[in-house]
Amino acid sequence: MLYPLIRKFFFSLDAETAHGIGMKGIDLMNAAGLACAVAKPVAACPVEVMGLKFPNPVGLAAGLDKNGDHIDGLAKLGFGFIEIGTITPRPQDGNPKPRLFRIPEAQGIINRMGFNNAGVDKLLENVRAAEFPKKGGILGINIGKNATTPIEKAADDYLICLDKVYNDASYVTVNISSPNTKNLRELQKDEALDDLLAQLKAKQLQLAEQYGKYVPMALKIAPDLDDEQITAIADALRRHRFDAVIATNTTLSREGVEGMPNATETGGLSGKPVFEKSTAVQKKLSIALAGELPIIGVGGIMGGEDAAEKIRAGASLVQFYSGFIYRGPDLVSEVAETLAHVMRKSV
């Protein structure tokens, strides 16, 4: 495919500018009926997770399409599911630019975006205008808190978002692990986590009764956790009967990129350098959960074998974002084909 040439052009631009142009390009190809032409056929590998039937276990991680502006174009690339967001109750600009940095030598990306988004109401407009969910496509909506909301009031923002997106989401992801919103990761700790999960579970059950359907919830966690924290999170997820966990978000560590250009930029590191760390956390989480709820493995997937390693470490589904930037649409078909082979062998 031509993506290596396209990437060369994109990488000559500022990262955020290139992102915007790339997303518009996907929309244009979709409108012209050409999106399928740039994507290879994707192997069928149906799986059932969280009570949802996925055509394949390969998902787009949150962050690429924050406002749900590009759902239909992205869907044509063969993803088994798409996650949009992170979205907050009110629109916000996020952190000052520049805030997105590539580390090509390590196939890494550092971002300090800060949940820049157009607000939950705008996202819902886009979701309702998209064809993908109407045709039964699995669409996750990732929710967060506004930067101006005090951390002790964070639950209010998550509850507002959950209430609004519930009827339009296939599943909802609760993001408490971005390193780019002040104190957000404090919500992963002990009483704060317990309180938040309890309130969200109560709201989920209330909404299930209101709408006559159960929409599963996943919690997205950080890779920068010790064994005790991983066990505590697993216990909380079981206690509050959450439906899944996404492991993991970006890391604050700079292991593997030391001394490289942009490596000292503030923000979360994703891409190949986070693979080992995120997979290690996922493996420990899988042991702690003992199969009681599914794991969506994300972090550093740059090829089919990386995704297979996530599955072997206990994941039921996988997602990527940075890999898509470095590898393009071919990564979707490669990962789907590898996982179809891995899952056939395990049956």
From Swiss-Prot:
InterPro entries: Aldolase_TIM (IPR013785), DHO_dehydrogenase (IPR050074), Dihydroorotate_DH_1_2 (IPR012135), Dihydroorotate_DH_2 (IPR005719), Dihydroorotate_DH_cat (IPR005720), Dihydroorotate_DH_CS (IPR001295). It comes from Dechloromonas aromatica (strain RCB). GO terms for molecular function: dihydroorotate dehydrogenase (quinone) activity. Binds 1 FMN per subunit. It is found in: Cell membrane. Its cofactor is FMN. Pfam families: DHO_dh. Belongs to the dihydroorotate dehydrogenase family. Type 2 subfamily. One of its GO terms (biological process) is 'de novo' pyrimidine nucleobase biosynthetic process. Pathway: Pyrimidine metabolism; UMP biosynthesis via de novo pathway; orotate from (S)-dihydroorotate (quinone route): step 1/1. Its EC number is 1.3.5.2. It is a peripheral membrane protein. It is an enzyme of class 1 (oxidoreductase). One of its GO terms (cellular component) is plasma membrane. Substrate binds at K66, N111, R112, M113, G114, F115, N175, N180, N249, T250. FMN binds at A62, G63, L64, D65, K66, T86, N142, N175, K220, T248, G271, G300, Y321, S322. NCBIfam families: PRK05286.1-1, PRK05286.1-2, PRK05286.1-4, PRK05286.2-5, pyrD_sub2. Catalyzes the conversion of dihydroorotate to orotate with quinone as electron acceptor. Keywords: Cell membrane, Flavoprotein, FMN, Membrane, Oxidoreductase, Pyrimidine biosynthesis. This is Dihydroorotate dehydrogenase (quinone). The active site is at S178 (nucleophile). It catalyses: (S)-dihydroorotate + a quinone = orotate + a quinol. Monomer.
